[in-house]
From Swiss-Prot:
It is found in: Periplasm. It comes from Morganella morganii (Proteus morganii). SUPFAM superfamilies: HAD-like (SSF56784). Its EC number is 3.1.3.2. The active site is at residues 68, 70. Dephosphorylates several organic phosphate monoesters including 5'-AMP, 3'-AMP, pNPP, PDP, 5'-UMP, 3'-UMP, G2P, glucose 6-P and ribose 5-P. No activity toward organic phosphate diesters. Also has a phosphotransferase activity catalyzing the transfer of low-energy phosphate groups from organic phosphate monoesters to free hydroxyl groups of various organic compounds. Its cofactor is Mg(2+). This is Class B acid phosphatase. Activated by ethanol. Also activated by Co(2+), Zn(2+) and glycerol. Inhibited by EDTA, inorganic phosphate, nucleosides and Ca(2+). Unaffected by fluoride and tartrate. One of its GO terms (molecular function) is acid phosphatase activity. Belongs to the class B bacterial acid phosphatase family.
Amino acid sequence: MRKLTLTLSALALALSLNSVADAKVYMPEKVSDGVTVAQLAEQHAIHWISVEQIEESLKGQPMAVGFDIDDTVLFSSPGFYRGKLEYSPNDYSYLKNPEFWEKMNNEWDKFSMPKKSGMELVQMHLKRGDTVYFITGRSKTKTETVTKYVQEGLRIPADKMNPVIFAGDEEGQNNKVSWMRDHKLKIYYGDADADIAAARELNIRGIRVLRASNSSYQPLPKAGQFGEEVVINSEY
């Protein structure tokens, strides 16, 4: 009798386990294929280009190329957001405050996140043997750790890392142009309209990198509006 009871108990346990295994989490019926965030970014008919396609187009001798930093290779909004709250919550005057730039250029980039697309672009150019320069519109400060964080975040070998160039931002002029000319750049990557305009002024190849939608730098620019190439999936 005891053996029969144990057998029946084991059978009941097995059946209960099978029913658990067969149970499925409820999912609604699919009514369309859906879309990812990356696919949404590609829906407009602009000149999309991938990192691989850029590399394929660059057959030949190494060259000098340049990158903007904020929203191009680094998602640095946390530092800028903190600066706005601390120095000018109601406007953007903090961007003219030397105290903010001392903080941003020396401490707050530790909260910046390297963009995957930025890393892929930089590594592609380094593999080609290109010389890479970083030209930012940030104001210059006596000391800076931006170079350190860019090098570490984008995994650039020390002997390939050039010090970050602080072009500054003056109303009515594009300070990046002279630096781009002096370093004989052939390509410049940036998220802002001014980056593409600077490249066009020098008749070099300006390639747009998408600014993340949650960037502190608003409003978002209209990528591709000048007919420039736009890097696919470069918002992150």
